[in-house]
Amino acid sequence: MNRRTFIQGLSLLPLSGLAVAAPQAAKKKSATLKVSLNAYSFNKLLNDAIRGRGEGVTLMQLLDFCARNKFDGFDATGYFMPGYPAVPPDSYIDGLRKKAADLGIGISGTGVRNNFTTADAAVRQEGVNHIKQYVEVAARLGAPVIRVFADTQMRAENWESVSKGATRAQVQDWIATNLRECAEHAAKFKVKIGVQNHGDFLKTGQELLTLIKAVGSPWCGPIVDTGYFKTPDPYVDIALVAPTSVNWQVKQSPLGEDSEVPTDLPKLLRIVRNSGYTGYLPIETLSPRGKPYDPYAVVPAFLKELRDAIAQTA
């Protein structure tokens, strides 16, 4: 049974069935986990290069960093590509893919910004069109997943404020309708739409699964952000969503970027293995507000911790 068939099968099961199906798959595929770097770990330096604020770093240069640190994959996030939100030239996409291939690095995914919680239907449709464009970028890159959001993505706003009094059910219908249109397009290019929980509209694992069920497409599934479930025990939410996950964002803390409580990586890896997930585990380190942050030091250290946990749970 391949990964696609497994996911499609899970979509037909009630949640109670996941507990039976997932461990069986885990026994067969427990060793096939690969580590990837999410480009956002270098957010400031990437934006420095884009805006001409000193030397910074580019996605191309981060591929060299990945090779030096023996990452298996790289999430080439769209908003660090030249000219974003415009689509980059084919020559750039092809060059990025070729360099990754030459270095033996897989492209584990990409991602874009969107807002499907706004009451402005025109803005939502712009987001749909934008995602469709970058689905084609993902396909050209060889990325299996494009990361999108069901959350507002604005620090000063939330889904309740931008939806202008709409109910949660109404907003979920907006999001599901938009994601369904994106998934229909993505299916043509064999790219999955990955929906990441980001602590606003999607605070819990059940909220994420409910949305994915409302979309109702095998080409749309959850991305588990291990640091953005706003619940008393995020590991419960992670375990709930893990069996149907299409990708991950492994964070340093389950309690958000400003927390000093570290992720229990062996516990997390046991959840991953029990879920039957196989594929990339991208890490995303974040810069805590008001504190020094050097991704060239932080990323390799966290990578080692993740690799140790993978080995420990094999």
Segments predicted by a language model, with ranges:
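Hydrophobic faces of well-ordered beta-strands that scaffold small-molecule active sites
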Residues: 33-38, 74-76, 107-112, 146-148, ...
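Short helix/strand-capping connector loops at secondary-structure junctions
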Residues: 47, 277-290
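Short aromatic-enriched loop/helix-cap "lid" or pocket-rim segments at secondary-structure transitions
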Residues: 49-50, 158-160, 208, 235, ...
